[in-house]
């Protein structure tokens, strides 16, 4: 991605929501590499899909020769960003936030290159400059540059100020000053000239630009990526079970892979532009091929492979594909013990059974049928499989061979109703 037309290329991918002084920024990028940053507040113990677009945007800039700074908000995470939030956030303890800071720093690291010469990435934590700052310094040196009149007119907090039931605390109201100072301080420490973030961060980003100009007499820039929406109007990055997380212990590689496989045709080519590094020509060719093939589109599989491989590595992708193929074909012999544990983690119905339970009892306990009588009927009509093999003996008792890894048995009724038995 050549620097001189990087903004144009990002726009072609639909990755620019707003940008300050686009012409001046394009000119600055054409002059040579810059340092830029994106902030990630530790509001949970993992990043989720909503963080992926700005994180990949940092990577896109690094690939074009620029220096990315990944800022984890050890201080701002203790305060809470009120931007477009309907109610006050619950304050987390310092211990919890510190623990989350470490986890998020580790999560961000694989996406960037920290050892590639002059544009090696930097990891920063804003607690480093706020942790020792006293309140007088904060109010005199930072607060004097902010107009309350302007702050209360920012869209991000306006709705909270107009609500009688919630309002906004001074704690959250001051968040804007903290994030604004981050930009100024990162300019001071690392000559950072550009901040990127989600479109909900526009108000905080412009505050940082104003403060850096006042404190350092320097023009700096801001760029936001769009809030990702789906064609059907529903929220992106959520499943029935909640958010899709980047941490494998919160959303397994298999479930993550399935999330992308289930992308609607109306969204998939747009998502390839947002979430992969494939060339636009390649994406357009794939769309054309899918349109003319007369078969199911290939794009969802390409998207699932690209993003799962990027987030979970080759091993995570291999496990996700192995589980997908095994469940589809019914042949479970290639699945590992860890694969079965992933299914249990993902919310596949799982029951614990004692060793003497028979098939009828297992089906009832698994809520695949309401009664033993119904179980007999289902088994007799060849509608039940054990580990992918049809079982038509209504009086069947499980054998050791049915307990894969001495522990797991996968039951299926019909084509789609699964339950994992975890033998005790």
Curated annotation (Swiss-Prot):
* SMART domains, per database record: S4
Q: Where is this motif: 'HIGH' region?
A: 42-51
UniProt catalytic activity: tRNA(Tyr) + L-tyrosine + ATP = L-tyrosyl-tRNA(Tyr) + AMP + diphosphate + H(+)
**UniProt motif 'KMSKS' region: location:** 235-239
* Enzyme Commission number(s) from the entry: 6.1.1.1
Q: Name one GO cellular component term.
A: cytosol
Q: Where in the cell is it found?
A: Cytoplasm
MF-aspect GO terms: ATP binding; RNA binding; tyrosine-tRNA ligase activity
Pfam families linked to this entry: SYY_C-terminal (PF22421), tRNA-synt_1b (PF00579)
Matching Gene3D superfamilies, A to Z?
HUPs, RNA-binding S4 domain, Tyrosyl-Transfer RNA Synthetase
Main function: Catalyzes the attachment of tyrosine to tRNA(Tyr) in a two-step reaction: tyrosine is first activated by ATP to form Tyr-AMP and then transferred to the acceptor end of tRNA(Tyr).
PANTHER family (UniProt xref): TYROSINE--TRNA LIGASE, MITOCHONDRIAL, TYROSYL-TRNA SYNTHETASE
Q: What is this protein called?
A: Tyrosine--tRNA ligase
Task: Tell me the organism.
Answer: Serratia proteamaculans (strain 568)
In the UniProt record, the gene name given for this protein reads tyrS
